[in-house]
Amino acid sequence: GPSFFAINLALAGHEVTAVDVTGEMLAHAKQNAESYGAKAKFVLHRGEFLPFEDNSFDLIVSRNVVWNLEYPEQALSEWARVLAPGGRMVYFDANWYLYLYDDELRAQKKAAEQAFRAKYPVHNYAGNLPKSRILELEQTAYSLPLSKEKRPEWDRAVLERLGMQIIKVIDDIGPGVQDPLDWERDHPIHTFMICAEKPET
């Protein structure tokens, strides 16, 4: 991503390595880091197949990454591999496209959007995309493996299978971190947080 976490962690005094799969985003991230005087190493690579030795990191942080991966379980396995014993992964994600498979959630999402538009008829928000673009995104998301999974239940099961210890799961962090208007529009789709630790032995 644009290095939000990388910048904040680097400015807090941590040694940071940032990974992204696209060169364009990585260049944007570098530019952002430089503008804040934050020092970090930037690596162009896929999150499912990391070019690092075992036990290399004390902390892995990500936001809105796992949902759009082609091999999400492989990614979590890699993250566990490169974590040092006692290290933790903390990530934020959501069931962004579960509504494509879940009729009840789809109805809730539609109702929330209609209520939002009725309340704020002239509000211009980022989610107001052309119908053709929405359909394009939905077609892409439909084939992704996590679009049909209920999360964070899926994540908890996979992490435990990988031998990770679940430290904390927050099913909906939206009200505390999202812009109030964004949350009002999108609240049927919960943004969650997971923290898991690699055991010492």
Regions found by a protein language model. Name each.
Residues 1-49:
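Class I SAM-dependent methyltransferase SAM/SAH-binding core
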Residues 88-132:
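Conserved class I S-adenosyl-L-methionine
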Residues 45-59:
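A short acidic, Gly/Pro-enriched loop at the edge of an enzyme's catalytic core
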Residues 15, 39, 88, 165-166:
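Residues at the starts of beta-strands that form the adenosine-phosphate
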Residues 145-170:
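Short alpha-helix
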Residues 162-165, 179-201:
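Core SAM-dependent methyltransferase catalytic element
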Residues 73-85:
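A short glycine-rich, Lys/Arg-flanked "PGG" loop and its adjoining helix->strand segment in the class I
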Residues 58-72, 95:
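A short SAM/SAH-binding and catalytic strip from SAM-dependent methyltransferases
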